[in-house]
């Protein structure tokens, strides 16, 4: 069989393309359209990170576009509406269903309510006109409420210059009200505005962790119009569990037990924890203080005595299973350099002490009833059976399968995008800022090359989830806890010490030098270059570590080359940071960093109009307004134009 030449392939490709563009007029129209789009201002990118399962806080930031909605309202109405009216209009756009109920309760006559409907619909139409001013009509149409697209387009493109259609427009709105469609229209318009103020969302890691509703965040992202994800350490932990790593699964369950979030497993994903509870009831007591679950801020009533006791037992059972499961990985992978984490082998079970990193510590709150001192890494038959059942349930959960599939489809370890590098954790470096090497399959890898190899193994483990002890599956676990992991970014994970050793000095997890060298402009420039980006214009946009503004830490580092935007959604960190974190907006005029205050509830926003935002800081302003031509999407369009012009020349101009 003869091979097809490159020239023949080109001809076949052009043949296929000419079926779609079967006349020079059609082809010219498409080229004109694409060339024109290149001249539009670039859309607004919205960067969020470290959501940690905090669905309500994330929803608020998403709905207000990190203050972008209010900014547009202020632009239009600062001189004509009072602050209270602006607050009410903003709350309506954020939470249209709830705000409508409150508004309607305030009117004592239908006539007054109808006047409000007319005014509000007009304001929302004006807002859509303003928010969509840099989009094509085609793109705008996709953002409009489907059921009302025709009506909304008529109102958007109305022209009263000659006064010929005044009564036509009035009748349109009046009939909407008379037919009781105004609530649905207002709701649809509000969601259109939310969509129009943000063109693309970047989630820079950690959708999962200690928060109660990561599943709802995943459902939101699946339905979002344009999104990408850079995996965080907790996201990879969930991917690893689904991909067959029992060590990842045990870690994940332990964290859920610790933060009283086992309902994510049982209720959200439909996984039966009864076998684990039965095992825990048999071997552990419910009073061990080190394993009592943390109190949840969103559960003011708290747990019953029985619930607390059961979770405490589960917490101990899964922690001991985790320590056992990690041992064979460490032993079969010497290049991981993790022998220090063979903790159960370092315990003296007679004296109840451990010798670790050259120092001996007494142990407290121990729960070693299932550990064989002669073979500490050996699982009991019932422990093995429980983990097999849990892994099977995990991999058979339809909802979890959908969520993990989306994480793999939209997610990567890092993303170069519009000249910037988006990464959740770090690029491992030594004390001199030189990129650290890590050996995988006999070869040394560092920087971008290391991250590419890590990602290949994550994808392989996911594709072959029935294999649970191969290198790829072990490397997913290593990404969670290893010292050369770009996601962990520390020298060791001291989980055992935190449970069982009083001396807090043993709890310390020294960070990779990256975190104290990221003020170094030269190091950041070198990294940008390694990832194929322009070091003069590019930036690293980083999540993972909360910015301690309370201590004067600045999220803008290395002369603006490094931006740290841990969203601070996790309520546990807000006492140490002083704020609820940062998000970032990047539009055609430049970048703005937005600091967020603690988010109380949507009820407070609805009643008080509070936006929970503080100052925006301009990171930079573009000397020339950025166009679509200057973006990743622009490069794709330019390549399409090149091919279409080739077709025009080849088929119609000869």
From Swiss-Prot:
Its EC number is 3.1.3.11. One of its GO terms (biological process) is gluconeogenesis. Its cofactor is Mn(2+). Keywords: Carbohydrate metabolism, Hydrolase, Manganese. It catalyses: beta-D-fructose 1,6-bisphosphate + H2O = beta-D-fructose 6-phosphate + phosphate. Pathway: Carbohydrate biosynthesis; gluconeogenesis. It comes from the Bacteria. InterPro entries: FBPtase_class3 (IPR009164), Metallo-depent_PP-like (IPR029052). One of its GO terms (molecular function) is fructose 1,6-bisphosphate 1-phosphatase activity. Disulfide bonds: none annotated. HAMAP family: FBPase_class3. Belongs to the FBPase class 3 family. This is Fructose-1,6-bisphosphatase class 3.
